[in-house]
């Protein structure tokens, strides 16, 4: 993962964790947690692709890795929808910018995860 992506993740996570939304900070904390989880999962997929020998390790370690991958795609789609919803309802420009950047990053991560997973299949 390049340094721009790392800093984008860190910046967005920091800003999202500091925001207090009228809806519920508990929901936002859940989004931040899922965002971090997806980042870690995407990183592990990328590392496995970099070392193609890890495909066999990945399959042996977790026979249901395709199922896990499907669950991660469901999580990222849910998170994308949540971010879109938050973007529609927020009136604060700082929050709008943060959510737009988060949405862009999530879409990039989803695309990278698809690319990595096709290389692993």
Curated annotation (Swiss-Prot):
It comes from Influenza A virus (strain A/Swine/Wisconsin/1/1967 H1N1). Interacts with protein M1. May interact with host nucleoporin RAB/HRB and exportin XPO1/CRM1. InterPro entries: Flu_NS2. Mediates the nuclear export of encapsidated genomic RNAs (ribonucleoproteins, RNPs). Acts as an adapter between viral RNPs complexes and the nuclear export machinery of the cell. Possesses no intrinsic RNA-binding activity, but includes a C-terminal M1-binding domain. This domain is believed to allow recognition of RNPs bound to the protein M1. Keywords: Host nucleus, Host-virus interaction, Transport, Virion. Belongs to the influenza viruses NEP family. GO terms for biological process: exit of virus from host cell nucleus through nuclear pore. HAMAP family: INFV_NEP. The lineage of its organism: Viruses, Riboviria, Orthornavirae, Negarnaviricota, Polyploviricotina. A motif (Nuclear export signal) lies at residues 12-21, 85-94. The keyword Transport applies. It holds the Pfam family Flu_NS2. The gene is NS. The keyword Transport applies. GO terms for cellular component: host cell nucleus; virion component. It is found in: Virion; Host nucleus. This is Nuclear export protein. Average number present in a viral particle is estimated to be 130-200 molecules. SUPFAM superfamilies: Nonstructural protein ns2, Nep, M1-binding domain (SSF101156).
